[in-house]
A protein has these predicted regions:
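N-terminal pre-Walker A segment at the start of P-loop NTPase domains
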Residues: 1-18
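Short phosphate-coordinating micro-motif centered on Lys-Gly-acidic
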Residues: 2-5, 50, 85-90, 96-152
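P-loop (Walker A) phosphate-binding loop of NTP-binding proteins
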Residues: 34-36
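Conserved lysine of the Walker
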Residues: 41
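Short beta-strand-centered segment that lines the nucleotide-binding/catalytic pocket of NTP-utilizing
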Residues: 54-70
Length: 152
C-alpha cells in the first residue's frame, strides 16, 4: 500500500498539507483520519476545506456527528465519530446515503465505526512527536493513489 509520511511542525503546516490533499479529494469517497485527542485531525480537515475554497469557520462536528459542505458539484461531509456509542448508530445517521452519494466523506475517529464503514480510499494517521506531528497517509485504492500523487 503506497504511503507518504510528513513531519508537520505547526498548525499552518497541517492546514497546508490538508490544502494539498484537497487538490485531488474529489476522486475519493472515503478518507479516514486517526489520532489522539488534539492531534490535529480537525486542523487537517480545515486545511482541506480551505483548499477547496471554504472561507468560513470549520468546527469539529463532535456533537452533530456530520458537517456538510458543498463546492459546486462536490459534496464534502466531515464526520467526527468520537462520541459515537454504537457503530449501529451510523445507520440512523444515513451513513450509507453519504457514502453512496456524489461526495467525499472525511471521517475522524473512524475506528469507532469498525466493521460498519467500508475500507477507505485513504487512511491517515496523525501522531504527536517532540517536534510536532507525524502524518502517515496510506492509500488503499487506485483513487486514493491519485490523491497521494498530489503530495509528491
Amino acid at each position: 500500500m503506497p504511503t507518504v509520511e510528513r513531519q508537520v511542525a505547526s498548525v499552518a503546516e497541517m492546514e497546508a498539507l490538508g490544502a494539498k490533499l484537497a487538490a485531488q479529494v474529489g476522486n475519493v469517497r472515503l478518507v479516514n483520519i486517526h489520532g489522539p485527542l488534539g492531534a490535529g485531525k480537525t486542523t487537517l480537515v480545515r486545511g482541506m476545506l480551505r483548499g477547496l475554497g471554504h472561507a468560513g469557520a470549520v468546527k469539529s462536528p463532535t456533537f452533530t456527528l456530520v458537517e456538510p459542505y458543498s463546492f459546486g458539484n462536490l459534496h464534502f461531509y466531515h464526520f467526527d465519530l468520537y462520541r459515537l456509542n454504537d457503530p449501529g448508530e451510523l445507520e440512523f445517521l444515513g451513513m450509507r446515503d453519504y457514502l453512496d452519494g456524489n461526495g467525499v466523506c472525511v471521517v475522524e475517529w473512524a475506528e469507532r465505526a469498525q466493521g460498519v464503514l467500508p475500507s477507505p480510499d485513504v487512511d491517515i494517521m496523525i501522531e504527536p512527536t517532540e517536534t510536532g506531528r507525524m502524518v502517515r497517509i496510506m492509500t488503499l485504492t487506485p483513487q486514493g493513489n491519485v490523491l497521494l500523487k498530489a503530495l509528491t
